[in-house]
Design a protein with these regions (language model features):
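Short, flexible, basic/aromatic active-site loop/helix in glycosyltransferases
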Residues: 114-115, 127-146, 218
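Conserved donor NDP-sugar-binding/catalytic core segment of glycosyltransferases
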Residues: 99-126
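Short, well-formed alpha-helical segments that are part of the catalytic scaffolds
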Residues: 11-28
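Acidic donor-binding/catalytic loop of UDP-sugar-dependent glycosyltransferases
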Residues: 48, 90-106
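Acidic donor-binding loop at a coil-to-helix junction in glycosyltransferase catalytic cores
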Residues: 171-177
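Conserved donor nucleotide-binding strand/loop of the catalytic core
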Residues: 50-82
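A conserved acidic beta->alpha catalytic loop
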Residues: 39-51, 94
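Short beta-strand/loop segment that forms part of the nucleotide-sugar
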Residues: 30-44, 61-63
Length: 230
């Protein structure tokens, strides 16, 4: 069995699309019919995230922590208890490609760190073009990158348990896990092959996360970003 884990805090705008994409990835023909479950960890949600996630086909678990490390760990625990041999992680504002899970497994590694793409920068209004240019100029979207994104991460259950899983960190829980995997000697594929598209939202949910990095880029002087994109 395979598992896909998604943490969510008040994500009613994005969760249906995120779960639908994850469900499609779990049904990909290259998986040979192996069962796949999608679990959404509802973290202090006060909106319709849970209803929408279940309607799209996910199982939900609940916690009141406002902590992404806790939420990821809870979703992973539910999948481990269900018998998942591989844990794939993404985010509630992210749509994985139909072959995303199959591509993770095809890399034949203990863990997979993937890249992210953005297909809509319009939420940044007049800054959209400048931010997009900065992303294209500075983001390394190729094999052997060293990005760590909770939105595009996979690990064998055996190695996940060996290193103790996600710590209950409010940010950088994904970085902490990958560093633990590196120390354990795990075979990690730093690959651009498994694809996801994430949002460029204006309100960062975690310090040090992808949205936070975008906001820091916006705070840089326009000339600095323009020079980087030249």
């Amino acid at each position: 069995m395979l598992g896909i884990a998604i943490p969510a805090h008040n994500e009613e705008e994005h969760i249906a699309a995120a779960v639908a994409a994850a469900m499609a990835a779990g049904r990909h023909a290259a998986l040979g019919g192996e069962a796949c479950e999608v679990v959404v960890a509802l973290d202090a949600c006060t909106d319709a995230t849970g209803v929408l996630a279940r309607a799209a086909g996910a199982r939900t678990v609940e916690v009141d922590a406002r902590n992404v490390g806790v939420a990821r760990a809870l979703a992973a625990q539910a999948l481990v208890q269900a018998g998942a041999r591989w844990l794939a992680f993404t985010d509630a504002d992210t749509r994985v490609a139909p072959d995303w899970l199959a591509d993770q497994l095809a890399l034949d590694a203990d863990a997979v760190c993937g890249c992210v793409g953005v297909d809509d920068w319009s939420c940044h209004g007049l800054d959209a073009e400048r931010l997009h240019a900065h992303f294209l100029a500075t983001y390394n979207d190729r094999d052997d990158h060293r990005h760590i994104h909770g939105a595009n991460l996979g690990v064998s259950t055996a190695l996940y348990l060996k290193v103790g899983g996600f710590k209950h960190l409010a940010c950088s829980e994904d970085v902490d896990l990958v560093q633990a995997l590196e120390r354990s000697g795990a075979r990690i594929a730093w690959s651009a092959r498994p694809r996801v598209v994430t949002s460029a939202r204006r309100q960062a949910r975690a310090v040090g996360g992808f949205a936070d990095a975008l906001l820091q880029a916006l705070a840089a002087p326009a000339g600095v970003v323009a020079a980087a994109a030249a």
